[in-house]
Amino acid sequence: MNDEDYSTIYDTIQNERTYEVPDQPEENESPHYDDVHEYLRPENDLYATQLNTHEYDFVSVYTIKGEETSLASVQSEDRGYLLPDEIYSELQEAHPGEPQEDRGISMEGLYSSTQDQQLCAAELQENGSVMKEDLPSPSSFTIQHSKAFSTTKYSCYSDAEGLEEKEGAHMNPEIYLFVKAGIDGESIGNCPFSQRLFMILWLKGVVFNVTTVDLKRKPADLHNLAPGTHPPFLTFNGDVKTDVNKIEEFLEETLTPEKYPKLAAKHRESNTAGIDIFSKFSAYIKNTKQQNNAALERGLTKALKKLDDYLNTPLPEEIDANTCGEDKGSRRKFLDGDELTLADCNLLPKLHVVKIVAKKYRNYDIPAEMTGLWRYLKNAYARDEFTNTCAADSEIELAYADVAKRLSRS
């Protein structure tokens, strides 16, 4: 996608962007705030976790200034990450022993629709519940609790970059990502746009800090940094950036090979796959009239089926002149191939919300016959970059408690 395409998209969303206040002054040009900077030292707070990727149980162990505590929680019963039995067995046969790799591939730029951003911003509430803080190896994390911000901080170091980053820290950018906090004021809250940026930075393999912001306390320092702006936003070497789409473009243009992988799309169609799902979901979940429910549900199912068709259609590089019959379907893991890309960072957080909320408030399940979509979800839930940036299911459900409307015959 060329610069002219970017400009057109940005012009369209500039006046409607719910998370951004234009012409933000760039304050606090230092890498971070003086009152919390001392907490960034790794020796202060350490974070270690264990994650079973099959059951999605987790145990978090904190060592904070010499005091050790543990937290265990089981979420497998309500996450619903596993596929229907018949699909799961089919996919295991189709993909025996496939490795899960943590690299990005060349893609074109990806942008979510303005409508999705408006709908999501209107629906994300500040209520929720404690999220799992299972940020696992191969990355190492530093946790900080800042009294000034009422936040939790995670410093992420990619294994491949860890030693190099420490030896040449002055040559690397200082990145601080600010995301919405959960109901406890510290864990990661429900916000697909926050998760989108979190995933991008993780996939890039860059060293970065994540600060969860408790909006209920409205910390003064946050207002000074980005007045009138709600998370997500980030600082890059002291410069404040508040527009999610522009942040994505900036990171892709700045964090480049050979050091950082490209994540932009090869196929334009991958960028728009599933683009109308969230708007169909929003209309469905907000509806209060029983007589309209069936039609709105069909609309959501139709949008999901369109995505399923795209995922089952081979990409040009998958087509082999010698293949025939049933083997012509795609077996790729993600939208644009076998690697997570910017397109996935945009779609997967929203798709996860749709899956959780539609089941909770409308008892709606993604149809089992959508094998391409279930394959996509299965592969996504096997990746730490996705599962460990998700809010807890209960957090998402509570965020929509006031949005999902009860059906009535009136």
Swiss-Prot record:
Domain of life from the UniProt record: Eukaryota
Motif (G-site): 191-194
InterPro entries documented for this protein: CLIC, CLIC5_C_GST, CLIC_N, Glutathione-S-Trfase_C-like, Glutathione-S-Trfase_C_sf, Glutathione_S-Trfase, Thioredoxin-like_sf
Domain GST C-terminal: start-end pairs: 260-400
Signal sequence segment: none
Pfam families: CLIC-like_N, GST_C_2
Gene Ontology molecular functions: chloride channel activity; oxidoreductase activity
EC category: oxidoreductase
Keyword annotations from UniProtKB, A to Z: Cell membrane, Cell projection, Chloride, Chloride channel, Cytoplasm, Cytoskeleton, Deafness, Golgi apparatus, Hearing, Ion channel, Ion transport, Membrane, Mitochondrion, Non-syndromic deafness, Oxidoreductase, Sensory transduction, Transmembrane, Transmembrane helix, Transport, Vision, Voltage-gated channel
Transmembrane regions: 193-213
Gene3D superfamilies in the cross-refs: 1.20.1050.10, Glutaredoxin (3.40.30.10)
Disease connection: Deafness, autosomal recessive, 103: A form of sensorineural deafness with onset in early childhood. Hearing impairment progresses from mild to severe or even profound before the second decade, and is accompanied by vestibular areflexia.
Function: In the soluble state, catalyzes glutaredoxin-like thiol disulfide exchange reactions with reduced glutathione as electron donor. Can insert into membranes and form non-selective ion channels almost equally permeable to Na(+), K(+) and Cl(-). Required for normal hearing. It is necessary for the formation of stereocilia in the inner ear and normal development of the organ of Corti. May play a role in the regulation of transepithelial ion absorption and secretion. Is required for the development and/or maintenance of the proper glomerular endothelial cell and podocyte architecture.
Sequence similarity: Belongs to the chloride channel CLIC family.
Stated name of the protein: Chloride intracellular channel protein 5
Biological source species: Homo sapiens (Human)
